[in-house]
């Protein structure tokens, strides 16, 4: 299987970094998945989303989570995030300490070109 960069140069990642209330981590994951996989998630309907997000859990602190996804347009992501925060209000956000669910945006400034990744593959 060919290697693939995590993201493409020129796009953006949103990185949410948050702490879930102690003892409610499994409930948080369940509520997150219920919302994320539903038709009610407007993020999945945006053409600006390049790669769907992944929810990650810190290996040293089980209360700490990260949500990372690739977007072509962070202005569009911020617009949809505002709708989530002010109108939809997903239940999983209620389990985040401080109820703060705001990402850090970062630009992808380097991504290994496909021809270099392909050349690095072992012969079959």
Predicted regions and their residues:
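Glycine-rich beta-strand-turn "strand-cap" elements at beta-sheet edges
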Residues: 1-10, 48-66, 89-124
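Active-site-flanking beta-strand signature of metal-NTP-handling nucleotidyl enzymes
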Residues: 11-19, 66-68
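Structured catalytic/translocation cores of nucleotide/phosphate-coupled proteins
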Residues: 13-14, 44, 64, 82
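Structured beta->alpha junctions
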Residues: 17-20, 57-59
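Short, surface-exposed ligand-recognition loops at beta-strand->loop->(often short) alpha-helix junctions
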Residues: 19-32
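Glyoxalase I/VOC metalloenzyme domain signal
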Residues: 23, 61, 72-76
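Short acidic, gly/pro-rich beta-turn/loop elements at beta-sheet edges
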Residues: 26-28, 63-65, 77-79, 113
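An amphipathic, aromatic/His-enriched active-site/gating alpha helix that lines ligand/cofactor pockets
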Residues: 34-51, 70-106
């Amino acid at each position: 299987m060919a290697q693939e960069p995590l993201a493409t140069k020129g796009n953006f990642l949103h990185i949410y970094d948050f702490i879930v209330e102690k003892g409610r981590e499994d409930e948080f994951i369940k509520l997150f998945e219920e919302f994320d996989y539903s038709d009610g998630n407007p993020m999945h309907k945006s053409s600006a989303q390049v790669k769907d997000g992944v929810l990650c859990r810190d290996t040293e602190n089980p209360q700490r989570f990260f949500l990372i996804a690739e977007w072509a347009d962070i202005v569009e992501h911020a617009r949809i995030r505002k709708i989530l925060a002010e109108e939809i209000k997903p239940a999983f956000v209620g389990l985040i300490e401080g109820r703060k669910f705001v990402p850090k945006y970062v630009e992808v400034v380097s991504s290994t070109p496909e021809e270099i990744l392909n050349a690095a593959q072992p012969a079959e």
